[in-house]
């Protein structure tokens, strides 16, 4: 059966008050010792895939995203969705709306891949497509694959 259903959990843009609170949390997190988070990049077929590999016990904050995304998550993490905190264990594929900003706390090693449309030909171009806050992005070395395949 090909019924279309509306998924209960989406990653949404926070309201202005919540966004301001998240930015305050970001400022506090930057004062703490930092953990290196390995980031892998894939640019292929008009899409940018960005995978973060997070160890257990990490609190991480994302940037405000300029585009709608798909988030593929595997692990054990409490995540702020834009309106509430939810614990996700195992494997999940979640829709993310433009303007969202997430906050995560890992309970076990967690891998998160965000996929978004992008005509970028470099990681720098893809990151600029993704957010206006590129200076806040994790940049630990990981795999970079650029196929030159177009959509």
Q: Model-found features: residue ranges?
A:
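Tight coil/turn sites that cap or link beta-strands
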Residues: 55-57, 91, 97-99, 107-109
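A short, N-terminal "cap"/entry segment at the start of jelly-roll beta-barrel domains
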Residues: 1-51, 133, 139-151
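Conserved short histidine dyad/triad with adjacent acidic residue
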Residues: 45-65
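Double-stranded beta-helix
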Residues: 107-151
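Conserved hydrophobic/aromatic beta-strand scaffold that supports enzyme active sites
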Residues: 49-53, 70, 85, 93-95
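Short acidic-glycine-tyrosine-enriched beta hairpin
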Residues: 78-102
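Short glycine/proline-enriched turns and hinge-like loops at secondary-structure junctions
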Residues: 63-66, 105-108
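Glycine- and acidic-residue-biased ligand/ion/polar-headgroup-sensing regions
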Residues: 65-83
């Amino acid at each position: 059966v090909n019924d279309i259903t509306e998924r209960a959990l989406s990653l949404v843009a926070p309201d202005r008050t919540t966004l301001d609170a998240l930015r305050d949390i970001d400022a506090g997190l930057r004062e703490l010792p930092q953990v290196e988070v390995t980031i892998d990049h894939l640019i292929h077929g008009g899409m940018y895939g960005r995978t973060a590999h997070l160890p257990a016990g990490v609190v991480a904050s994302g940037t405000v995203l300029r585009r709608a995304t798909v988030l593929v998550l595997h692990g054990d993490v409490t995540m702020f969705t834009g309106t509430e905190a939810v614990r996700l264990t195992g494997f999940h594929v979640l829709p993310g709306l433009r303007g969202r900003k997430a906050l995560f706390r890992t309970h076990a090693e967690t891998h998160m891949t965000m996929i978004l449309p992008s005509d970028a030909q470099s990681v720098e171009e893809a990151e600029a497509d993704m957010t206006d806050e590129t200076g806040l992005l994790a940049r630990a070395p990981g795999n970079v694959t650029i196929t030159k395949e177009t959509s």
